[in-house]
Amino acid sequence: MLNLKELCHELSISLATGQNWLRLGKISPTGIEEGQPYFSAEDAEEIRRALADAKGGRLQSRRNKSHVSGLEIYTSYLGDNAVNQEVLPHLYECFTEEFLQRNCLGILRHYAKSLLQQAGLPESLAVFPGQSTESLSESERWPSVFLVQGQDFLGYLYLSLQSRGIRKANGAYYTPTRIVHQLIESLDVDWDIRILDPCCGTGNFLLALRDKPCDADRIYGQERDPVAAAIARINLALAFQISDPVFLQKHIREGDSLTDWYGKSWDLILGNPPWGLSFTEKKKRMLKRNFDMASGKRVDSAAVFLEQSLYHTEEGGRIAFVLPEALLQVASHRKLRERMLEQAVIERADFVGNPFSGVFCPSVLLTLRKGKKSDAYAGIFVEMGGICWRIRDGRKITADNFYLTMTDEEYDWYKKIEALPEACYLKGQADFAIGIVTGDNRKWLQTQEEEGHEPILRGTDISAFRIQAPSAFIRFCPEEYQQIAATEFYRAPEKLVYRFVCNRLQVACDRERRLTLNSCNIVIPRIPGLKMEYIMAVLNSEVLQFYWKKRFASAKILRHHLEALPIPPAAAGEQEAIIALISADREQLEKRIRKLYRLPEENSPF
C-alpha cells in the first residue's frame, strides 16, 4: 500500500497537487487508516493510466451524466448504482422533453402514490399544487419505483424534470445524498433537540434524520418552492410513517426564510441554503434594509441565510450548512467571517470539492456553535480529501487569516514564506493587462492563419515556462472588440503571460509581441534589479504554487493574487544561474528557489 506522499512520488507530482486531486474527487483512496488515505498498487496504476490518457496531462474528473437539451439527469444525487437510478433515463427515452416538463406534477403524483402505497400510507398525502395539463394515460410505459428508506427519489425526479435555467435562477443545487449523510454524521449533538432546515428543498436532510434518535415532533422545514415543499411533506411521511396531513403541513411550511422566518429560535439549523439566488430589485432593497450581509453591491443569498441563521440559533445551538468555499476566502465576504467569529465558534469544516453535478463550485460543510469557546474546546476539526487534522486552539483565525485548509504544519511553512525579509512584490512594480475580449469568438477567431490574420494566445496555449504553437488566429481590429488593453502591452518586446483560469500558476515569457485572448493575461514586471525570466521561474516554483493555493484557493489567477506573492531578491549571478536551470534541471531549480526563501529541505509540503 502507498500513502499519499508515496503515490505522488510514483506519479511525479507534488504533494500539494495530490492533495488537491483528493479534495476535488479526481482520485479516490483505496481506504483510510488513522485519518490518512492509502492506495493499492492496482489503484495507483489505474491513476497513472488515467493521467497518461488525459488530454494535456491533466487528470479529469469522471462524471456519469446524461444530457437532454434543457434537462439533465442528476445521477450523482442518489449515489452510484442506487436503486431507482434508471427511472429517469427510461422516461427520457419514452417521452419528449416537452411532455416531461409539461406533466411534471402528474408524474410526481404518480410516483408519490406508488411510494406511499408501498409504505402503507394513504395515497391522499400525494398533494401537489396545480394539476397536470393532460391525462397521463401512458402510465403502463412508466418503469416501477421501489421504496428505499431514506432515499429522496421524488427530489431526484423533480430536479431532473426542471430545466437548468430555472434551477440556476432559483439557486436550486440539491445536495447529493452522500453529502447529506456526511454532514449529518459529522454532528456530535444530543438529538433530543428542535431542528430546522430553513430552505429544505425536497427534504433530503430531514430524511437523513430518520437514522438518528430523533422524534419527528422535533423536525421542521421551510421551503419557498411549493412543489419542493409538497415533496418534503411526502418524504417526511415516508421516513417517519406519518399519515396526518395536518402534522405534515405544520412541520413543512411553505415560505421564504429570508422574509418570513419559521419560529423564533432553534437548537440546530442545518441544510444547504441557496447559492447565487436571483433577486428582484424590490427584494434587494428589502434585504439591504434588514441584513448587514446584503449591504454590498451584490447580494449573496448564502451569506444572508447564514446571517439570518446565526440570529435565530439558541445560545449553544449549532448551525451545519453546505456552503461555497468562497464565503471563507473571498475578500467581499470578510464581514460575514467577522460575524461568524464574533457570534460563534467554528467546530468543524469538511471540504468536499465540487459535489454538485455540472457546477464548478468548491464547497465546505461548516459546523458552528453559537456562543463563546468552552474549556473543552480543542480547536477546529478539518477534513479535506480524506485527510483529517485539527487546528490548534492557539492558532489565530481572523476574517483576513481564515486559512482552514492548512494544517498547522502547512500554516507554519506558509508563515515562513510570508515572513521572507526584503521580499519584493509586483504590486506597484508591474504593468498588468487583460487579454482581448472579442465579444464573439466565433466571429473573430479562425483555426487557420489567413491573410490579414495573426496568432493570438489562449490560456490553453500556456504552461509553466512554455508557450505551445497557437491554434487560433485573429484579424487585429482593436476598435471593434468588446474590451482591449492598450496595444503597447500586447506588442511589448518581452512580457509574461499566464493562464487566467487554472488551479496552479502557469507563467511563460513571450518575446514575439503576440496578442492574447482574455483567457491569457499579461504582466510586465518592473522590479528594479530583477530579470523577467527570474521572476517567471519564481512564479512557477512549487514554493509559490503552495503559497498561492493555500492563501487564495481559487480557480482563477487574479491580479491581486500576483501582486501579493513574495518574490525573493537575488544577486545578478544567482538570477542567471536560476534562469539557466529552467531548461537544464528543474529539480535543482526548485532547490535553489527554496534556498532563496530560506526554507529547510526537511519535511517540505511541496
Protein language model regions, located:
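Polyanion-binding surface elements
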Residues: 1-21
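Short coil turns linking two alpha-helices in DNA-binding domains
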Residues: 14-17, 202, 272
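Polybasic, glycine- and aromatic-enriched phosphate-binding surface used to engage nucleic acids
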Residues: 15-16, 20, 310, 411-577, ...
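Signature of N6-adenine DNA methyltransferases within the class I
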Residues: 26, 30-37, 178-179, 216, ...
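Short helix-start
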Residues: 28-53
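Leucine-rich, amphipathic alpha-helical/linker segments
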Residues: 60-76
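Class I S-adenosyl-L-methionine
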Residues: 72-238, 256, 329-336, 560-585, ...
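Conserved SAM-binding strand-loop segment of SAM-dependent methyltransferases
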Residues: 245-255
